Amino acid sequence: MAKKDYYEILGVSKTAEEREIKKAYKRLAMKFHPDRNQEQDAEARFKEIKEAYEILTDAQKRAAYDQYGHAAFEQGGMGGGGGFGGGAEFSDIFGDVFGDIFGGGRRQRASRGSDLRYNMELSLEEAVRGVTKEIRIPTLEECGVCHGSGAKPGSSPVTCPTCHGQGQVQMRQGFFTVQQACPHCHGRGQIIKDPCNSCHGHGRVEKAKTLSVKIPAGVDTGDRIRLAGEGEAGEHGAPAGDLYVQVQVKAHPIFEREGNNLYCEVPINFAMAALGGEIEVPTLDGRVKLKVPAETQTGKLFRMRGKGVKSVRGGSQGDLLCRVVVETPVNLNDKQKQLLKELEESLGGPSGDKNSPRSKSFFDGVKKFFDDLTR
Protein backbone atom coordinates (compact mmCIF):
# COMPACT_ATOMS: atom_id res chain seq x y z
CA MET A 1 0.00 0.00 0.00
CA ALA A 2 1.37 3.40 -1.00
CA LYS A 3 2.54 5.60 1.86
CA LYS A 4 0.66 8.80 2.51
CA ASP A 5 2.24 12.13 1.63
CA TYR A 6 4.06 13.63 4.64
CA TYR A 7 2.68 17.10 3.98
CA GLU A 8 -0.88 15.72 3.86
CA ILE A 9 -0.34 13.84 7.14
CA LEU A 10 0.52 17.09 8.93
CA GLY A 11 -2.01 19.15 6.97
CA VAL A 12 0.55 21.71 5.76
CA SER A 13 1.54 22.98 2.33
CA LYS A 14 4.78 21.97 0.59
CA THR A 15 6.08 25.51 1.15
CA ALA A 16 5.32 25.48 4.90
CA GLU A 17 8.00 26.89 7.19
CA GLU A 18 9.44 24.85 10.05
CA ARG A 19 7.43 26.90 12.55
CA GLU A 20 4.15 25.87 10.83
CA ILE A 21 5.25 22.23 10.72
CA LYS A 22 6.06 22.20 14.44
CA LYS A 23 2.72 23.81 15.28
CA ALA A 24 0.81 21.25 13.19
CA TYR A 25 2.79 18.41 14.73
CA LYS A 26 2.11 19.45 18.32
CA ARG A 27 -1.61 19.82 17.62
CA LEU A 28 -1.92 16.41 15.96
CA ALA A 29 0.38 14.66 18.42
CA MET A 30 -1.73 15.92 21.31
CA LYS A 31 -4.84 14.56 19.57
CA PHE A 32 -3.52 11.10 18.66
CA HIS A 33 -1.02 10.34 21.44
CA PRO A 34 -1.89 6.84 22.76
CA ASP A 35 -1.80 8.11 26.36
CA ARG A 36 -4.71 10.41 25.57
CA ASN A 37 -6.53 8.76 22.66
CA GLN A 38 -7.86 5.23 23.19
CA GLU A 39 -9.14 4.75 19.62
CA GLN A 40 -7.88 1.64 17.85
CA ASP A 41 -5.88 3.46 15.16
CA ALA A 42 -4.50 6.23 17.40
CA GLU A 43 -1.07 4.64 17.86
CA ALA A 44 -0.63 4.05 14.12
CA ARG A 45 -1.70 7.63 13.37
CA PHE A 46 0.68 8.97 16.00
CA LYS A 47 3.63 7.04 14.50
CA GLU A 48 2.69 8.34 11.05
CA ILE A 49 2.58 11.94 12.35
CA LYS A 50 5.92 11.54 14.16
CA GLU A 51 7.59 10.09 11.06
CA ALA A 52 6.33 12.96 8.89
CA TYR A 53 7.59 15.50 11.42
CA GLU A 54 11.04 13.90 11.61
CA ILE A 55 11.50 14.11 7.86
CA LEU A 56 10.07 17.57 7.24
CA THR A 57 11.99 19.31 10.04
CA ASP A 58 15.36 18.04 8.84
CA ALA A 59 16.57 20.21 5.94
CA GLN A 60 18.50 17.42 4.18
CA LYS A 61 15.79 14.82 4.56
CA ARG A 62 13.10 17.23 3.47
CA ALA A 63 15.08 18.13 0.34
CA ALA A 64 15.54 14.44 -0.45
CA TYR A 65 11.83 13.77 0.13
CA ASP A 66 10.79 16.71 -2.05
CA GLN A 67 12.98 15.35 -4.88
CA TYR A 68 12.53 11.57 -4.59
CA GLY A 69 9.50 11.07 -2.35
CA HIS A 70 9.43 8.03 -0.06
CA ALA A 71 12.01 6.27 -2.26
CA ALA A 72 14.69 8.48 -0.70
CA PHE A 73 14.37 6.56 2.58
CA GLU A 74 14.05 3.03 1.26
CA GLN A 75 17.09 0.73 1.29
CA GLY A 76 19.21 1.37 -1.78
CA GLY A 77 17.37 4.55 -2.72
CA MET A 78 19.22 7.35 -4.57
CA GLY A 79 22.00 5.01 -5.72
CA GLY A 80 23.54 4.43 -2.30
CA GLY A 81 22.97 7.84 -0.80
CA GLY A 82 24.92 10.26 -2.94
CA GLY A 83 25.18 13.63 -1.27
CA PHE A 84 24.47 12.32 2.26
CA GLY A 85 27.81 10.66 3.00
CA GLY A 86 27.56 7.80 5.47
CA GLY A 87 24.10 8.79 6.74
CA ALA A 88 22.77 11.32 9.23
CA GLU A 89 21.65 10.47 12.77
CA PHE A 90 18.19 11.41 13.98
CA SER A 91 18.03 13.52 17.12
CA ASP A 92 15.38 12.38 19.54
CA ILE A 93 12.84 14.98 18.45
CA PHE A 94 10.09 13.26 20.41
CA GLY A 95 11.84 14.16 23.66
CA ASP A 96 12.91 17.63 22.46
CA VAL A 97 9.62 18.84 21.04
CA PHE A 98 6.95 16.69 22.66
CA GLY A 99 8.51 15.94 26.01
CA ASP A 100 7.31 19.17 27.58
CA ILE A 101 3.72 18.13 26.91
CA PHE A 102 3.79 14.53 28.12
CA GLY A 103 6.89 14.52 30.31
CA GLY A 104 8.72 12.48 27.68
CA GLY A 105 12.42 11.87 27.42
CA ARG A 106 14.74 9.22 26.15
CA ARG A 107 13.58 6.57 28.57
CA GLN A 108 10.12 5.14 28.25
CA ARG A 109 8.04 5.80 31.34
CA ALA A 110 6.73 2.87 33.32
CA SER A 111 3.10 2.23 32.47
CA ARG A 112 0.34 3.56 34.71
CA GLY A 113 -1.85 0.85 36.18
CA SER A 114 -5.01 -0.18 34.37
CA ASP A 115 -8.38 1.22 35.40
CA LEU A 116 -10.89 -1.25 36.85
CA ARG A 117 -14.69 -1.38 36.65
CA TYR A 118 -17.11 -2.78 39.20
CA ASN A 119 -20.85 -3.14 38.53
CA MET A 120 -22.89 -2.41 41.66
CA GLU A 121 -26.59 -3.21 41.99
CA LEU A 122 -28.59 -1.03 44.38
CA SER A 123 -32.17 -1.06 45.57
CA LEU A 124 -34.17 2.09 44.89
CA GLU A 125 -34.10 2.92 48.60
CA GLU A 126 -30.29 2.65 48.69
CA ALA A 127 -29.94 4.80 45.59
CA VAL A 128 -32.27 7.48 46.96
CA ARG A 129 -30.87 7.65 50.49
CA GLY A 130 -27.22 6.79 49.83
CA VAL A 131 -25.36 3.83 51.26
CA THR A 132 -21.87 2.58 52.12
CA LYS A 133 -21.06 -0.86 50.71
CA GLU A 134 -18.07 -3.15 50.94
CA ILE A 135 -16.85 -4.68 47.70
CA ARG A 136 -14.15 -7.23 46.95
CA ILE A 137 -12.23 -6.96 43.68
CA PRO A 138 -9.38 -8.95 42.09
CA THR A 139 -6.51 -6.64 41.14
CA LEU A 140 -2.75 -6.21 40.78
CA GLU A 141 -1.13 -4.58 43.79
CA GLU A 142 2.38 -3.33 44.34
CA CYS A 143 4.61 -6.13 45.59
CA GLY A 144 5.11 -5.70 49.33
CA VAL A 145 8.49 -7.43 49.25
CA CYS A 146 10.30 -5.33 46.62
CA HIS A 147 7.95 -2.31 46.87
CA GLY A 148 7.33 -2.36 43.13
CA SER A 149 10.94 -2.33 41.92
CA GLY A 150 10.88 -5.96 40.77
CA ALA A 151 14.36 -6.54 42.23
CA LYS A 152 15.15 -8.87 45.12
CA PRO A 153 15.53 -6.98 48.42
CA GLY A 154 19.13 -5.87 48.84
CA SER A 155 19.63 -5.61 45.07
CA SER A 156 18.72 -2.94 42.55
CA PRO A 157 17.91 -2.75 38.85
CA VAL A 158 21.07 -2.38 36.76
CA THR A 159 21.80 -0.32 33.68
CA CYS A 160 20.75 -2.07 30.48
CA PRO A 161 23.91 -3.24 28.64
CA THR A 162 22.20 -2.97 25.25
CA CYS A 163 21.20 0.71 25.36
CA HIS A 164 23.55 1.75 28.20
CA GLY A 165 20.67 3.22 30.17
CA GLN A 166 19.30 5.36 27.33
CA GLY A 167 16.16 3.29 26.83
CA GLN A 168 16.61 3.57 23.06
CA VAL A 169 18.81 2.00 20.42
CA GLN A 170 19.78 3.19 16.95
CA MET A 171 18.42 1.26 13.99
CA ARG A 172 19.34 1.66 10.33
CA GLN A 173 16.45 2.77 8.10
CA GLY A 174 17.40 3.50 4.51
CA PHE A 175 20.06 6.18 4.57
CA PHE A 176 19.36 7.24 8.10
CA THR A 177 19.75 6.02 11.63
CA VAL A 178 16.58 6.16 13.72
CA GLN A 179 16.06 5.62 17.43
CA GLN A 180 13.65 3.02 18.77
CA ALA A 181 12.78 1.64 22.20
CA CYS A 182 15.40 -0.83 23.36
CA PRO A 183 14.08 -4.39 22.87
CA HIS A 184 16.10 -5.66 25.85
CA CYS A 185 14.81 -3.30 28.57
CA HIS A 186 11.63 -2.21 26.72
CA GLY A 187 12.66 1.44 26.88
CA ARG A 188 13.23 1.60 30.64
CA GLY A 189 17.04 1.85 30.53
CA GLN A 190 17.34 -0.70 33.34
CA ILE A 191 16.97 -4.45 33.70
CA ILE A 192 16.34 -6.73 36.68
CA LYS A 193 19.27 -9.14 37.07
CA ASP A 194 18.18 -10.54 40.43
CA PRO A 195 14.35 -10.63 40.37
CA CYS A 196 12.15 -10.59 43.45
CA ASN A 197 11.00 -14.10 44.41
CA SER A 198 7.53 -12.85 45.32
CA CYS A 199 6.59 -11.06 42.09
CA HIS A 200 9.21 -12.66 39.79
CA GLY A 201 10.50 -9.26 38.71
CA HIS A 202 7.15 -7.76 37.74
CA GLY A 203 6.84 -5.45 40.75
CA ARG A 204 3.15 -6.41 41.10
CA VAL A 205 1.24 -9.35 42.54
CA GLU A 206 -2.33 -10.60 42.07
CA LYS A 207 -4.55 -9.96 45.05
CA ALA A 208 -8.19 -9.52 46.01
CA LYS A 209 -8.79 -6.39 48.03
CA THR A 210 -11.80 -5.19 49.99
CA LEU A 211 -12.91 -1.59 49.70
CA SER A 212 -15.59 0.46 51.43
CA VAL A 213 -17.46 2.47 48.81
CA LYS A 214 -19.65 5.41 49.81
CA ILE A 215 -22.56 5.85 47.40
CA PRO A 216 -24.03 9.37 47.53
CA ALA A 217 -27.78 9.89 47.85
CA GLY A 218 -29.62 10.40 44.57
CA VAL A 219 -27.57 8.21 42.22
CA ASP A 220 -29.32 6.51 39.31
CA THR A 221 -28.65 3.78 36.78
CA GLY A 222 -25.72 4.74 34.56
CA ASP A 223 -24.01 6.94 37.16
CA ARG A 224 -20.34 6.19 37.67
CA ILE A 225 -18.31 6.76 40.84
CA ARG A 226 -14.53 7.16 40.50
CA LEU A 227 -12.17 5.97 43.21
CA ALA A 228 -8.82 7.51 42.32
CA GLY A 229 -5.80 5.24 42.69
CA GLU A 230 -7.85 2.12 43.51
CA GLY A 231 -7.23 0.43 40.15
CA GLU A 232 -4.30 -1.83 39.33
CA ALA A 233 -0.85 -0.83 40.59
CA GLY A 234 1.42 0.69 37.95
CA GLU A 235 4.50 -1.03 36.62
CA HIS A 236 7.73 -0.55 38.60
CA GLY A 237 6.37 2.15 40.87
CA ALA A 238 4.25 4.00 38.27
CA PRO A 239 0.93 5.48 39.49
CA ALA A 240 -2.02 3.15 40.04
CA GLY A 241 -5.10 3.28 37.85
CA ASP A 242 -8.58 4.21 39.05
CA LEU A 243 -11.61 2.13 40.01
CA TYR A 244 -14.96 3.04 38.45
CA VAL A 245 -18.10 1.81 40.22
CA GLN A 246 -20.97 1.58 37.72
CA VAL A 247 -24.41 1.94 39.32
CA GLN A 248 -27.43 -0.19 38.34
CA VAL A 249 -30.67 0.42 40.26
CA LYS A 250 -32.98 -2.60 40.51
CA ALA A 251 -36.65 -2.37 39.53
CA HIS A 252 -38.99 -1.52 42.43
CA PRO A 253 -42.35 -3.28 42.95
CA ILE A 254 -44.20 0.01 43.60
CA PHE A 255 -42.26 2.98 42.28
CA GLU A 256 -40.83 3.93 38.92
CA ARG A 257 -38.21 6.66 38.65
CA GLU A 258 -37.85 9.32 35.99
CA GLY A 259 -35.05 11.73 36.79
CA ASN A 260 -35.72 12.91 40.33
CA ASN A 261 -39.47 12.18 40.22
CA LEU A 262 -41.10 8.98 41.41
CA TYR A 263 -44.31 7.52 39.92
CA CYS A 264 -46.73 4.97 41.34
CA GLU A 265 -50.19 3.65 40.47
CA VAL A 266 -52.92 3.91 43.11
CA PRO A 267 -56.03 1.73 42.60
CA ILE A 268 -59.38 3.07 43.89
CA ASN A 269 -62.87 1.61 43.60
CA PHE A 270 -65.43 3.30 41.40
CA ALA A 271 -67.49 4.46 44.37
CA MET A 272 -64.57 6.48 45.72
CA ALA A 273 -63.82 7.74 42.22
CA ALA A 274 -67.39 9.04 41.95
CA LEU A 275 -67.93 10.29 45.50
CA GLY A 276 -64.37 11.22 46.55
CA GLY A 277 -62.59 10.21 49.73
CA GLU A 278 -59.23 9.80 51.39
CA ILE A 279 -56.69 6.99 50.98
CA GLU A 280 -53.19 6.19 52.20
CA VAL A 281 -50.42 6.07 49.61
CA PRO A 282 -46.83 4.86 50.04
CA THR A 283 -43.77 7.11 49.87
CA LEU A 284 -40.13 6.29 50.54
CA ASP A 285 -40.53 8.05 53.89
CA GLY A 286 -43.67 6.16 54.95
CA ARG A 287 -47.41 6.43 54.34
CA VAL A 288 -49.20 9.70 53.68
CA LYS A 289 -52.87 10.54 53.13
CA LEU A 290 -54.14 11.54 49.70
CA LYS A 291 -57.48 13.29 49.20
CA VAL A 292 -59.32 12.03 46.13
CA PRO A 293 -61.89 14.55 44.87
CA ALA A 294 -65.29 13.44 43.60
CA GLU A 295 -65.63 12.52 39.92
CA THR A 296 -61.97 11.43 39.59
CA GLN A 297 -61.21 9.57 36.37
CA THR A 298 -58.63 6.85 35.68
CA GLY A 299 -55.24 8.30 34.76
CA LYS A 300 -55.50 11.45 36.87
CA LEU A 301 -52.12 12.39 38.37
CA PHE A 302 -51.76 13.72 41.90
CA ARG A 303 -48.47 15.43 42.65
CA MET A 304 -46.95 15.22 46.13
CA ARG A 305 -44.21 17.81 46.19
CA GLY A 306 -40.86 16.98 47.75
CA LYS A 307 -41.64 13.27 48.07
CA GLY A 308 -39.34 12.23 45.23
CA VAL A 309 -35.55 11.95 44.99
CA LYS A 310 -33.08 14.58 46.10
CA SER A 311 -30.67 15.47 43.30
CA VAL A 312 -27.24 13.84 43.64
CA ARG A 313 -25.77 17.25 42.82
CA GLY A 314 -27.70 18.93 45.63
CA GLY A 315 -30.48 21.46 45.38
CA SER A 316 -34.14 20.68 44.79
CA GLN A 317 -35.93 17.43 45.51
CA GLY A 318 -38.21 15.69 43.05
CA ASP A 319 -41.91 14.89 43.50
CA LEU A 320 -44.03 11.77 43.85
CA LEU A 321 -46.75 11.49 41.20
CA CYS A 322 -49.61 9.13 41.99
CA ARG A 323 -51.62 7.92 38.99
CA VAL A 324 -55.15 6.88 39.92
CA VAL A 325 -56.55 3.69 38.39
CA VAL A 326 -60.32 3.16 38.85
CA GLU A 327 -60.83 -0.55 39.46
CA THR A 328 -63.79 -2.48 38.09
CA PRO A 329 -65.34 -4.64 40.85
CA VAL A 330 -65.13 -8.42 40.43
CA ASN A 331 -66.68 -11.47 42.16
CA LEU A 332 -70.01 -9.66 42.66
CA ASN A 333 -72.85 -11.38 44.51
CA ASP A 334 -76.47 -11.20 43.34
CA LYS A 335 -77.35 -8.26 45.55
CA GLN A 336 -74.40 -6.23 44.31
CA LYS A 337 -75.25 -7.00 40.71
CA GLN A 338 -78.84 -5.89 41.27
CA LEU A 339 -77.68 -2.65 42.87
CA LEU A 340 -75.38 -1.95 39.92
CA LYS A 341 -78.22 -2.56 37.46
CA GLU A 342 -80.40 -0.13 39.34
CA LEU A 343 -77.54 2.38 39.34
CA GLU A 344 -77.06 1.93 35.59
CA GLU A 345 -80.76 2.56 34.95
CA SER A 346 -80.71 5.65 37.13
CA LEU A 347 -77.73 6.93 35.10
CA GLY A 348 -79.68 6.60 31.87
CA GLY A 349 -77.97 3.50 30.51
CA PRO A 350 -74.43 3.13 29.06
CA SER A 351 -74.65 6.44 27.19
CA GLY A 352 -76.32 8.57 29.82
CA ASP A 353 -75.56 12.17 28.91
CA LYS A 354 -75.79 13.73 32.35
CA ASN A 355 -73.67 11.41 34.47
CA SER A 356 -71.31 10.06 31.77
CA PRO A 357 -70.38 12.97 29.49
CA ARG A 358 -67.44 11.12 27.93
CA SER A 359 -69.62 8.10 27.15
CA LYS A 360 -72.27 10.32 25.56
CA SER A 361 -69.62 12.07 23.48
CA PHE A 362 -68.21 8.73 22.35
CA PHE A 363 -71.56 7.20 21.36
CA ASP A 364 -72.64 10.40 19.63
CA GLY A 365 -69.43 10.21 17.61
CA VAL A 366 -70.04 6.57 16.71
CA LYS A 367 -73.59 7.35 15.57
CA LYS A 368 -72.37 10.23 13.38
CA PHE A 369 -69.67 8.00 11.86
CA PHE A 370 -72.18 5.36 10.74
CA ASP A 371 -74.70 7.99 9.60
CA ASP A 372 -72.01 9.49 7.35
CA LEU A 373 -71.22 6.05 5.89
CA THR A 374 -74.84 5.43 4.85
CA ARG A 375 -75.38 8.77 3.14
Curated annotation (Swiss-Prot):
Question: Gene name?
Answer: dnaJ
Per the record, the GO terms for biological process are: chaperone cofactor-dependent protein refolding; DNA replication; protein refolding; response to heat
Per-repeat ranges for CXXCXGXG motif: 143-150, 160-167, 182-189, 196-203
List residues binding Zn(2+) 2.
160, 163, 182, 185
Residues involved in Zn(2+) 1 binding: 143, 146, 196, 199
- Gene3D superfamilies, sorted: DnaJ domain, Heat shock protein DnaJ, cysteine-rich domain, Urease metallochaperone UreE, N-terminal domain
Lineage of the source organism? Answer: Bacteria, Pseudomonadati, Pseudomonadota, Gammaproteobacteria, Enterobacterales
**SMART domains membership:** DnaJ (SM00271)
This protein is called Chaperone protein DnaJ
